[in-house]
């Protein structure tokens, strides 16, 4: 009897985890830069600049008030992905401890990032996950958000290299997560999230080392 109960519990847990992963991934697929540029401006942002479907490349290429739409889209999809994830878990399991809800946020956040970076509806060519990732950090814990966003803003302002601030965000995320939540599952998920962000910036790392990386400017290139 006990074995059957545990088996049913594991099946329910796996089902809930899969549902959260799928919904978070498809939320992440709604890439603001691609949607606005391709369907509103009729000029895919991935055909310009760095070829990245992210906020920085969109601003450098198009600028204008539609940048706010890109920001709003990438922020809201991360919020929705995590909210739905929490709702799913609470629907399957009642009175879940805080640590479990936190782990769900990381799980949903990871798949939201995967959807943003590799969107199936846009030929798996998406962004680098900084804005969505930063939103996920805020949703998880203000202490994590403070370290991630604080370092990002300081480095970006001082050096004008958005990529350098982004690398800080990706690299610091797992370590501050480890400090705040020394749980093996959470640490693994945090390293997966941070590792994805750093990996997506591998070309930027090469340009930073060679001194050819573009600096951010509020005046977009014509």
Show where each model-derived region lies:
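Short, strongly hydrophobic alpha-helical membrane anchors
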Residues: 1-15
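N-terminal signal-anchor transmembrane alpha helix
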Residues: 15-40
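Nucleotide and nucleotide-moiety/phosphate-recognizing core
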Residues: 16-20, 66-70, 76-121, 140-147, ...
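Cytosolic, membrane-interface loops and tails of multi-pass inner-membrane proteins
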Residues: 34-67, 126, 206-222
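Short, non-helical or kinked segments that cap or interrupt transmembrane helices
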Residues: 43-55, 121-134, 161-169
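Interfacial segments of multi-pass membrane proteins
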Residues: 57-64, 85-88, 111, 128-159, ...
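Loop-to-transmembrane alpha-helix initiation sites
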Residues: 146, 162-169, 181-193
């Amino acid at each position: 009897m006990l074995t059957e109960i545990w088996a049913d519990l594991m099946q329910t847990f796996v089902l809930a985890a899969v549902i959260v992963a799928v919904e978070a991934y498809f939320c992440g697929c709604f890439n603001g830069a691609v949607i606005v540029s391709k369907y509103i401006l009729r000029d895919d942002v991935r055909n310009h600049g760095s070829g990245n479907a992210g906020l920085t490349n969109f601003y450098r290429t198009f600028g204008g008030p539609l940048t706010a739409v890109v920001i709003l889209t990438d922020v809201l999809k991360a919020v929705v992905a995590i909210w739905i994830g929490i709702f799913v878990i609470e629907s399957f399991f009642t009175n879940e401890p805080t640590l479990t809800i936190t782990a769900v946020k990381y799980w949903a956040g990871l798949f939201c990032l995967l959807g943003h970076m590799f969107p199936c509806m846009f030929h798996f060519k998406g962004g680098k996950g900084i804005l969505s990732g930063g939103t996920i950090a805020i949703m998880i814990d203000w202490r994590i958000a403070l370290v991630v966003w604080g370092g990002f803003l300081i480095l970006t302002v001082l050096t004008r290299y958005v990529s350098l601030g982004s690398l800080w965000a990706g690299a610091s995320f797992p370590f501050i997560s480890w400090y705040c939540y020394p749980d093996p599952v959470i640490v693994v998920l945090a390293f997966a999230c941070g590792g994805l962000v750093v990996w997506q910036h591998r070309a930027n790392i090469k340009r930073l080392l060679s001194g050819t990386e573009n600096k951010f400017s509020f005046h977009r290139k014509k």
